[in-house]
Structure formats: structure tokens, C-alpha cells
């Protein structure tokens, strides 16, 4: 094959995998099992796998499929009996590759959900606990209910983790064989379990396998998203006076906004202006706290845009998840940014919080011994999947050839000219009766387009972060004749658009018009996201078409083509029909994709060290939780105090737990302080880096030095507390010494920051608070 080097570079070898997978599936003859009773079919399943064993120290080993064709045939027969679904050969191929630990690419409408569920059964029959990971809780609950009868058939327990469950309910579900859950929910439970003081309070039971739906979205787009557990505590929010001051500052005089609109920089004149207005000698006093507040206010005022990054609803700021076009309830920004935006919008300002612990999604995925996944656009993410997860991509050909027609992009000089062309195009296509799905970049753009269409006499349905509750109903009817649906990012919607909508009688009518027509308004930051939108048309051999409208003012072109010149003569309506213009847009998108990969690689270098340090802290926590190590240390340190407590008749169990709580309190507190320190270091690393030493090297040096002192401080403070705290038969009275854990905690996600450069600034991080 002439391009073997290409597939290897992408972490893929599709031809080899396709040939082998087809050969195995060809041998999977379910008719051999159709005459068996349910009990006999279950027995047959247990005969073709070997269950894993557990060693004395609790580690699992073994567990394998002994006869793959037989297992696939049994799974196919079980799906037919329990779900009334006859899996296609391509779904069986997908299941086979998942069982081999690949990320499989299956086009929209090819049945990824069933393939993933059959793989989950295959893993569970080996005695492995399986987490089926989704992008949101709705899909987790839906798929658990939908695929549940097949798990029940094999006697496998299953359930879905939801954010409204109690700790006891979560503990019960985590003990089951197959658990469905949104990636953020599973991660938040990891964080909460890392703050327990009694092992019995742990809710999670470790899993052996992760089957990840929308794998590229979870493992690439959100790989470096920190999931954060925070405690109530005021944060560095800018005062109202600073917010008002920033509103009066002039761009290019007092501050500069970077060309890519990811950073804002205070000028010397701007710093002098602030110092004069606030009556301070220097912005850099008090460890730069005032400077931080000014920078936060500048970010809120000039980088975060209403109806793009957030909406205001019911007097509150609600953040928008740009990769999914949704609002996640109770979202937050960190570092006072939430309060700064609230002040900017004239709303009541809320308190910030202290980070107790955090973990990136990439580190969370890395906790699973086995990982596989499925998505419609895996191949384009193959390089990242190989580089960061050592995973291979297997491409599964569609069950019916894709006949969608993808027209060449139409590129315009300005966004206004592009938008005019979009409206005219939609009006013309609607006359044919062809349904249209129009993908926009953000909420504001979707609403502006909807208004323009209405003015042109076209009614449309709008699906964005402001009305995502209506998603199921809107998507269900998006394939009806003449229907126009305007939507923000379609990734993770989890629902196929069926031609004719819910009315089967209209299917043929829509087919005659050419099927679903997808219109893209601007290119997304990667071709993979463009393809996710295109992939909504042409499912299961249906006809369909797609066309993207682009302008030279679009973010992807402006950022990816920064500093480059393009000479081309536009037509009267602003259209640039030259082939070189199309090539330039493609180039800009590739540059943007490269920048994102650089940011991923650089940011992972920062987070990798934090992950390694967290692992050390967690190992220490486990020792303290599971042994009497805390009591042994503290009683050895102060023999007289230990003897006195025993004389009081306090049981050994109570004393061990009291010592455990003392030691864990200070360990957790020192870890939280360490995270805050690392945040500060990373914010200012470009200022602290010594000559000829890279910022990442300086960050490593400083973080390792600080971490080396963490354990010693925690132990010394624990010993001091043990000497002084009152310990009764009820345990250690830490509260009487003012050693309180936060009165309230919440969890949130910090999105992979679109406002920062690869240098690692996190000031502009977009955060999504979930609880």
C-alpha cells in the first residue's frame, strides 16, 4: 500500500484491520445458536470466554475471548432476541475491534450504540467491570435503558450514574457489572472519593475497562479539561471600582488584545492609568493581587462575549460549552472570572472558591487498565490518540456506501457577504422541499441567522444553548420536507436525523428532493468538527449533500492565516471562486489544528507532573485510610499523649480514626495549597523563567521543589494538632481548633482554554460548574 507511512503516522492500519475483522465476522454464524434456549445461549457464552482472576493483593489478571467468532454470533443472537435488532456485519466488526482495544470510526447512523453495548457485554462476560462513558448524562441514561434488556439477558447488572443520585445510590451502581456515565460525573466521583476519611464512604468500585462514546470529543477535544472540586471561599474577584475602571480603558493605548483574541495585555500606559485612578504606587504590590484583579476584569470585558461564551438567564451568567453548543447548569469560571463577568453584566456578584483537587480528563481516562472507543471521526484524531493514549484507530466501512455529495466551499471576503449568501442559498434550497440543517459557530450567530431567514420569509427551528431542552423534539423533525433547522455544534447530540422526521410516509418524498442538506456557516477549528456536521447527512445510504460558506474574517482563517497575504479578485457579491482561495482556507485550518496540537502537547507536560504528584499523594492517602499508619506515627511522636488517651478508656478504633482524620486533614489541605501555588506559578511562568531555560523546565523545577516540602509540612502540622486537639470517645474535635473543611463543595469543568496560548496561561479559562 503506497501510503502505509501515512496510516502508521495516524496510529491506524485500516486495511489490515478491516480484512481481519471481516474474516472473523464472516465466521460468526448466529444461526448455529438460534435453536438454543435462553439458558443454553447464556451457557454457550460462558464457554467461549475465560473470566479474569484476582490475586491476593486485589490485582486482576487474565480474562480473554477464547473463540471470537462464536462470541460475536452469540451477541448477535442475543441482540435479536432482547432488542429486536439484527446487528449488521459492520456493527459486529466494530464490536470485534472494540474488544481488541481500538478506537473505531463508524459513520453517523451506523449503530455505534449497539456495537458499544455488545462490546461491553463481551468484556463483562470476562469478569471485567465496564464503564461505558458518554458525553452527557442524558445519553448515559438513554443508552442504559435502551440496551438494558441485553445486559439483563446475560445476568449482568447495569445502571447509569446521574448527578441527582445520593452517595448510597451511586455506591450501589458502581458495584454493578456495566455502568453508564457522563465523563464529568465519573471524574467528579473520583475527586470526591479522594477526600474521604473512612474507606466505607468511598462510592466508586474501580473499573477494568472504559468504552468511550464520541471518543475524539472526550479524549482529544476535552483531554486537558480539568475537573475541579472546590470549597466555598472568596476568590480574587475584581472590585466594582476596577470593573468600572476597565470599561474606561482604551484599546491599543491602555491594553492590547492579541491577534488571535486569546490574550489581553496591559500596556505601560495602562498600568500607569490604573495606578493613578486607584491611588496606588504600584500594581505589583501585595504579590501582584491587584494586577491579577485588573487582568481578570480585562479578560471579562474584552475576551468573553455574551451569547458566544455565555448567556444571561434569570439574572445569572450561564456558560456555554462551545464544543457541544449547550449550557451545563450551574457553570462557573475560576480565579474571580465568574465575578468579573457578573460585574460586567451588572448582576449580583457571587463568591469564588478554593480548589480542593482537580484531575484532567486525559488523566482520568488513563486510570482505566483497558480503553477503547467509538466515534464518527476517529481517523482525523488518530495522531493524538496514538501519541497521548497509545491507541490505534480502526475504520469500519459503512453498511451501505455513502452517497452524500460534498460541494466545494464558497469563500467570501467578509462575514456580512458570507451571511447574505447563506440566506439566499437557504431560500433557494427550501423551494425544492429539501430539509436543511444549518450549523453555526455560536449562539449569537445562530440567532442572527434565524432573524435574517425570518426576514427573508423562511421559518426555522433554532437549537442552541438557550433552548437545548427542546433538542429531542427539534432533531426528531429536522428531516421533514422543507424544514430548516439552525443549530450550534452538533457533536454529542446523540440523535440521528431521519429523513421525513417522525412521519415515515414522508421519507420517500424527502429522498426524492435529495435528502438532508447540511449548510456550514464558517469552518470549525478542525476538519474533524466540520465532518461531524457533514456526517448528519447521508446516513445509512440515504442521499444527502453539504456545503460550507466561509469568509476571510472567520476566526479559523484570521488565526490560521495571521501574517499571510492572499491576492485574489472577488466577484461583485464578495465570492472568491479561485481554487487558491480554497487551498488557503484549508491551509489556515491545518495551521489552527497544528496550534491546538501544540497547546495539547505543551499543556500535557504541565499536567503530567501534577498527575504524577497526585498519584503520590493518593498512594499516601490509601495507606492512611487502610492502615493504622497515622496513629503509629502520631503516637510514636508523642508517647505521653498517646498513653494519656488510652488511660481515658478511648478505644483503639476511635484513636486510630482520630489520628487518620488529623493526618488526612493536613495532607488534603497541603495538597490544595500546592495546587493554588502551581496555578500561580503557571500564570507567571513567563516572568519567572530564567534566561535560556524554557517555561516548562522552570515550572518543573519549582513544582518539584515545592512538592518535596509538602509531606513534611503535612506531617509536622498533624503532629502539632495531635499534641493540642481534644480527642474524646467521639473522635478528634478538629472544629474546636478552627480546622474546618469547607462548609460546601461543588464541582465544575474548566474547558481546554480557547483564550490561552501554548505558553500555558490559564487566566481566561472557561469553566463549567456542574454542581
From Swiss-Prot:
ATP binds at residues 91, 109-113, 496. Its EC number is 7.4.2.8. GO terms for molecular function: ATP binding; protein-exporting ATPase activity. GO terms for biological process: intracellular protein transmembrane transport; protein import; protein targeting; protein transport by the Sec complex. SMART domains: SecA_DEAD, SecA_PP_bind. It catalyses: ATP + H2O + cellular proteinSide 1 = ADP + phosphate + cellular proteinSide 2. The keyword Nucleotide-binding applies. It holds the Pfam family SecA_PP_bind. It is a peripheral membrane protein. It is found in: Cell membrane; Cytoplasm. Its main location: membrane. PROSITE patterns: SECA (PS01312), SECA_MOTOR_DEAD (PS51196). Keywords: ATP-binding, Cell membrane, Cytoplasm, Membrane, Nucleotide-binding, Protein transport, Translocase, Translocation, Transport. SUPFAM superfamilies: Helical scaffold and wing domains of SecA, P-loop containing nucleoside triphosphate hydrolases, Pre-protein crosslinking domain of SecA. It is an enzyme of class 7 (translocase). Part of the Sec protein translocase complex. Interacts with the SecYEG preprotein conducting channel. Has a central role in coupling the hydrolysis of ATP to the transfer of proteins into and across the cell membrane, serving as an ATP-driven molecular motor driving the stepwise translocation of polypeptide chains across the membrane. HAMAP family: SecA. PANTHER family: CHLOROPLAST PROTEIN-TRANSPORTING ATPASE, SECA INNER MEMBRANE COMPONENT OF SEC PROTEIN SECRETION SYSTEM. Monomer and homodimer. Part of the essential Sec protein translocation apparatus which comprises SecA, SecYEG and auxiliary proteins SecDF. Other proteins may also be involved. This is Protein translocase subunit SecA 2.
Amino acid at each position: 500500500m503506497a501510503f502505509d507511512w501515512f496510516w502508521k503516522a495516524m496510529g491506524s492500519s485500516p486495511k489490515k484491520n478491516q480484512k481481519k475483522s471481516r474474516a472473523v465476522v464472516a465466521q460468526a454464524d448466529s444461526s448455529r445458536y438460534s435453536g438454543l434456549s435462553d439458558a443454553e445461549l447464556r451457557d454457550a457464552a460462558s464457554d467461549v470466554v475465560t473470566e479474569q482472576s484476582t490475586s491476593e493483593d486485589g490485582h486482576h489478571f487474565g480474562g480473554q475471548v477464547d473463540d471470537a467468532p462464536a462470541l460475536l454470533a452469540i451477541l448477535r443472537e442475543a441482540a435479536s432476541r432482547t432488542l429486536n435488532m439484527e446487528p449488521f456485519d459492520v456493527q459486529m466488526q466494530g464490536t470485534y475491534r472494540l474488544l481488541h482495544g481500538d478506537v473505531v470510526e463508524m459513520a453517523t447512523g451506523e449503530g455505534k450504540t449497539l456495537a458499544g453495548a455488545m462490546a461491553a457485554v463481551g468484556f463483562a462476560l470476562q469478569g471485567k467491570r465496564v464503564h461505558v462513558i458518554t458525553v452527557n448524562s442524558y445519553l448515559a441514561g438513554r443508552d442504559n435503558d435502551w440496551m438494558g434488556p441485553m445486559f439483563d439477558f446475560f445476568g449482568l447488572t447495569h445502571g447509569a450514574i446521574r448527578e441527582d443520585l445520593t452517595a448510597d445510590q451511586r455506591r450501589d451502581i458502581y458495584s454493578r457489572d456495566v455502568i453508564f456515565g457522563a465523563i464529568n460525573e465519573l471524574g467528579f466521583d473520583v475527586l470526591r472519593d479522594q477526600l474521604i476519611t473512612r474507606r466505607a464512604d468511598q462510592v466508586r468500585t474501580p473499573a477494568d475497562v472504559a468504552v468511550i462514546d464520541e471518543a475524539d470529543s472526550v479524549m482529544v477535544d476535552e483531554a486537558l479539561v480539568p475537573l475541579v472540586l472546590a470549597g466555598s471561599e472568596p476568590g480574587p474577584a475584581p472590585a466594582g471600582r476596577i470593573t468600572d475602571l476597565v470599561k474606561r480603558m482604551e484599546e491599543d493605548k491602555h491594553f492590547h488584545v492579541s491577534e488571535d483574541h486569546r490574550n489581553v495585555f496591559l500596556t505601560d500606559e495602562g498600568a500607569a492609568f490604573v495606578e493613578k485612578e486607584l491611588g496606588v504606587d504600584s500594581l505589583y504590590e501585595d504579590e501582584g493581587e491587584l494586577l491579577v484583579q485588573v487582568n481578570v476584569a480585562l479578560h471579562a470585558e474584552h475576551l468573553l462575549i455574551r451569547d458566544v461564551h455565555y448567556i444571561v438567564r434569570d439574572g445569572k451568567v450561564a456558560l456555554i460549552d462551545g464544543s457541544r453548543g449547550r449550557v451545563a447548569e450551574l457553570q462557573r469560571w475560576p480565579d474571580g472570572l465568574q465575578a468579573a463577568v457578573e460585574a460586567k453584566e451588572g448582576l449580583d456578584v457571587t463568591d469564588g472558591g478554593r480548589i480542593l483537587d482537580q484531575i484532567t480528563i486525559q488523566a482520568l481516562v488513563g486510570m482505566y487498565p483497558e480503553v477503547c472507543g467509538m466515534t464518527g471521526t476517529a481517523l482525523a484524531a488518530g495522531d493524538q490518540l496514538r501519541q497521548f493514549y497509545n491507541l490505534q484507530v480502526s475504520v469500519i466501512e459503512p453498511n451501505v456506501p455513502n452517497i452524500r455529495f460534498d460541494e466545494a466551499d464558497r469563500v467570501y471576503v467578509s462575514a456580512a457577504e458570507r451571511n447574505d449568501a447563506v440566506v439566499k442559498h437557504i431560500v433557494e434550497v427550501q423551494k425544492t422541499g429539501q430539509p436543511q440543517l444549518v450549523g453555526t459557530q455560536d449562539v449569537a450567530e445562530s440567532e442572527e441567522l434565524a432573524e435574517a431567514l425570518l426576514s427573508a420569509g423562511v421559518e426555522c427551528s433554532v437549537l442552541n444553548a438557550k433552548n437545548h431542552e427542546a433538542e429531542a423534539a427539534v432533531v426528531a423533525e429536522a428531516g421533514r420536507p422543507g424544514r430548516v433547522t439552525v443549530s450550534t455544534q452538533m457533536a454529542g447530540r446523540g440523535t440521528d436525523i431521519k429523513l421525513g422526521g417522525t412521519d415515515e410516509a414522508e421519507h420517500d418524498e424527502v429522498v426524492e428532493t435529495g435528502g438532508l442538506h447540511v449548510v456550514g456557516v464558517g469552518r470549525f477549528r478542525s476538519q474533524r468538527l466540520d465532518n461531524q456536521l457533514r456526517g448528519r447527512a447521508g446516513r445509512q445510504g440515504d442521499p444527502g449533500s453539504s456545503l460550507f460558506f466561509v469568509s476571510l474574517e472567520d476566526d479559523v482563517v484570521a488565526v490560521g492565516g495571521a501574517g499571510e497575504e492572499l491576492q485574489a479578485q472577488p466577484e461583485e457579491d464578495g465570492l472568491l471562486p479561485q481554487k487558491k482561495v480554497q487551498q488557503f482556507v484549508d491551509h489556515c485550518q491545518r495551521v489552527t489544528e497544528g496550534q491546538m496540537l501544540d497547546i495539547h502537547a505543551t499543556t500535557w507536560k504541565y499536567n503530567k507532573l501534577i498527575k504524577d504528584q497526585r498519584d503520590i499523594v493518593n498512594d499516601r492517602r490509601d495507606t492512611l485510610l487502610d492502615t493504622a499508619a497515622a496513629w503509629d506515627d502520631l503516637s510514636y511522636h508523642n508517647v505521653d499523649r498517646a498513653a494519656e488517651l488510652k488511660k481515658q478508656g478511648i478505644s483503639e478504633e476511635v484513636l486510630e480514626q482520630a489520628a487518620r482524620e488529623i493526618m488526612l486533614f493536613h495532607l488534603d489541605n497541603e495538597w490544595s495549597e500546592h495546587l493554588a501555588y502551581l496555578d500561580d506559578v503557571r500564570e507567571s511562568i513567563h516572568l519567572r523563567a530564567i534566561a535560556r531555560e524554557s517555561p516548562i523546565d522552570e515550572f518543573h523545577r519549582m513544582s518539584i521543589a515545592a512538592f518535596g516540602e509538602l509531606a513534611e509540612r503535612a506531617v509536622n502540622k498533624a503532629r502539632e494538632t495531635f499534641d493540642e486537639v481534644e480527642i474524646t470517645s467521639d473522635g478528634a474535635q478538629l472544629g474546636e481548633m478552627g480546622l474546618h473543611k469547607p462548609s460546601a463543595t461543588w464541582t465544575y469543568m474548566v474547558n481546554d482554554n480557547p483564550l490561552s496560548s501554548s505558553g500555558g496561561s490559564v487566566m481566561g479559562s472557561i469553566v463549567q460548574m456542574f454542581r
